[in-house]
Amino acid sequence: RYISVTGVQTCALPISAALKAADAVKKRIAWVVLQKIKGTPMDDVAECPPVDDKVLTMDEFEFKNSEVLHKPTSKIFTFVEALKMAYFNRMSLGEYAHFKTEGLGYDKAKGVGTPFKYFTNGVAASEVELDTFTGELKVLRTDILMDLGRSLNPGIDHGQVSGAFVQAMGWVTSEKLYHNKDGKLLSHSPTTYKIPNVQDTPRIFKIDFIENNGNTANVHRSKAVGEPPFLLGVSVWTAIKDALKYKSGKAIPQIISPATPEVVLMELAKYDSQL
């Protein structure tokens, strides 16, 4: 969905590289529109000059509702018209920019500072069922709660969270690497390296978001959601350990990851030998 320019500009901290690049393109479009309003023949202009406050006053322009408004003259151009003017007058509509997050620093000795501009937090609870004869696992239910600030697209964020969780679930339950004595990887294909499929996903899978406006460091007060939910998949591994503890009646076992059916059966065999 479209995020209004006014909403983006409410970020108190410097904009990202993408927004910096977009801002440069906006200035070029505004400059071309201004030449059109002034009636300047574009053949007399070799190229768009470096656009700064001396050349162009961006406050005179408003980009909104797919239109470009020049406030002093009240002239309005559709966004398509403005783009065509820029394109056919050989103005670049592409740009790149670099951005370095400001205000970061951390004193390891004192344990104080700001190592990251913001944190993406989440919590997950998983319920599992173990087959004591085969060591196979079923994830009966998983509930996830994520803090993503103000979500730009809840549908995409939901997919990111669920995908990262399932990926991590496979990482801690089935994705085991095998090497021969020479160090050559043997589990190098789907036939030897088991990744989770749709049947491995939680039978009940609920994901919810906490929406807040506290993150001023990112676009539209949103938060990144690529990798952070991956760590929540560890809840499946810890649930397996709790299930084994219930079976043994003793302390939580120190099993390895991934907790494959073989690992589970070997742990269960220890309990049988102790009976």
Question: Where do the protein language model's features map onto the residues?
Answer:
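Single conserved hydrophobic/aromatic residue that forms the stacking wall/gate
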Residues: R1-C11
